[in-house]
Amino acid sequence: MNTDNGMILITALIRPHMEGHVVRALHDLADFPGFTFDEVRGQGRGRGQGGAYVVSDEDITYHQYLELRLVCPADQADEICRRIEAAAWTGRKGDGVVYTMPVNTFARIREAGAKEHRHD
C-alpha cells in the first residue's frame, strides 16, 4: 500500500440532472480517473422566506444531490475540479459544492491482491 502517493480525494455534490454533463467532462480527460456516485440529500446555507429558519417535524425538507467521489494525482486535481464546476453549473442557488482532501494511503485491491498471491 502506498502511503506517500500525492493523491487527492475530490468530492462534489451536484444536481442530479447535471450528472450527464459531469460524466462527459470526466470522460473527456486524457487520464480518466474513474469515479463513484451516491444519491444523497441535505440542506445548504439558505434560509426560509424573509431570512427566518423555521423547522418542525412536519416541514423538514431536503434537496436531492448526487455525491461524486474520485481519487486522482495531486497535479490533476485543480483541472478536474474546474471541469466538474463548469459541467455542473446552472447559475442557480443550490448548484452544489466541490472540495478536496489529501489521501494518506491508496491501493488498488486487484493489484495488491496479485502481489499477495504471486507464486515466484
Where are each of the predicted segments found?
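Positively charged, small/polar-rich N-terminal and surface patches that mediate targeting and assembly
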Residues: 1-120
